[in-house]
Swiss-Prot record:
The lineage of its organism: Eukaryota, Metazoa, Chordata, Craniata, Vertebrata. It comes from Gallus gallus (Chicken). Gene3D superfamilies: High mobility group box domain (1.10.30.10). This is SRY-related protein CH7. GO terms for molecular function: DNA binding. It is found in: Nucleus. One of its GO terms (cellular component) is nucleus.
Length: 54
């Protein structure tokens, strides 16, 4: 989407992607959810003492 619309603001991109995400079925979302879980586990293993502190 960013390549197709290089001048689009990040907030607008996020809104559009969020709307598209809501239209996906659970089966279509599953690969992305599984990948996020895998990456989270990998980061936790690499950085076990990391704590998010805004």
């Amino acid at each position: 989407m960013a390549l197709e619309n290089p001048k689009m603001h990040n907030s607008e991109s996020s809104k559009r992607l969020g709307a598209e995400w809501k239209l996906l079925s659970e089966a279509e979302k599953r690969p992305f959810i599984d990948e996020a879980k895998r990456l989270r586990a990998m980061r936790m293993k690499e950085y076990p003492d990391y704590k998010y502190r805004p």
